[in-house]
Amino acid sequence: NSGQAISDLIRRKWLDNDFYGSLFNFIYDKNSIKLILGGTLNKYYGDHYGEVIWARNAGNSEIRHRYYDNYGNKEEFNLFAKFQHTFNDKLYAFVDLQNRNINYDAELIGGNNINKSFNFFNPKAGLYYKLNSNNEFYFSFARAHREPTRTDYENGNPFPEKLDDFELGWKHKGKKSIYNINLYFMDYNDQLVLTGERDDVGYYVRANVGESYRAGIEFDGIFFINDYFTIKPNITFSSNKNNDYLTQFDGSLRNFGKTDISFSPNLIFGNTVEYNLNSKTLLFFNTKYVGKQYMSNTNVDSSILASYLVNDLGLNYNFSIPGFFQDSELKLLVNNLLNQKYESYGGHYFYDIDNKTYSGSYFYPMAEINFLLGLDFNF
């Protein structure tokens, strides 16, 4: 305005959303057969607009001038059926079927429009076997599809992802311990993964990566050592790989081969040790370890997010004041007890100069030792 082409300004983006939904189901449960039939219908209508709320050189423009005014609408209709058959007191099987129909209608900044329709068929089937009162085993297969989001379309031309998930597990429940062990293999086609970059409003950018997989073993449990001590560990070992990662690099399309999927550490460990001082006082110690991970699917060294180990110490005290408070609780938590300096997240970006690709990273440092004090009152 008034000949001004460049100005410092502050902009603010808004969403004005309406969501409507309905669902129905029919349940049949008799003898050894249980059947559930149902469906849902959801409609989302969103207005997306941005305003200029301050400008150094405003010219003739008004405050809260809308520099874009778009919409984003999504309709979804799905039908599902859940069938379970109990063969005997030790074995039962289930089959779940779902059909999702999705319609996107949206306008993006720059005048680009989305007019997409998807029809996904998602089956799941499995077996449960109860060996005895303490041990149970299961196996399942599921196929799932996921459509891109509006943000994905704003940052590229994505495809929906497809997943085939295989799981095998063991559940144990005894007097002194409760634990679950789960093996999984997740085979993806066109998985939408984080690239490490952010768009101009801070959303993480995702992109399809062709063929990829996530495979691993998960363990979580509770161990009752005695009347005072309880240990609650959980651990995941995994391998998360892009089979052939292709991207533009140094002016041409490069195949980086098999790489780790971004933000997917191979080892995650957590543990809680609880000690009951008495019937009113609980002392606990939390430990969390996250292994090394990459913030870029290229796995270049500059995108490494280092592993970290952090510990917390807490105390819960239950009390009552007759006539005032019942079953109230005082909570004290010391986060990052050992004052560890670490980063739990960050980002990675690329830029090209004369057909040469350069990269950089940024990190989010976490708080050093800090304290929380809380009171819960029940009247």
Give the role of each language-model region.
Residues 1-109, 130, 177-183, 232:
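Face-selective signature of the C-terminal outer-membrane beta-barrel domain
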Residues 27-34, 90, 134, 176, ...:
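Short loop/turn motifs that connect adjacent beta-strands in outer-membrane beta-barrel proteins
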Residues 30, 41-47, 97-105, 141-147, ...:
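Transmembrane beta-strands of outer-membrane beta-barrel pores
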Residues 33-39, 93-95, 123, 137-139, ...:
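Transmembrane beta-strands of outer-membrane beta-barrel proteins
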Residues 89, 185, 207-298, 376-378:
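Gram-negative outer-membrane beta-barrel transporters
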Residues 130, 136-140, 160-246:
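Membrane-embedded beta-barrel scaffold of Gram-negative outer-membrane proteins
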Residues 231, 239, 289-294, 318-379:
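C-terminal beta-signal and adjacent terminal beta-strands/loops
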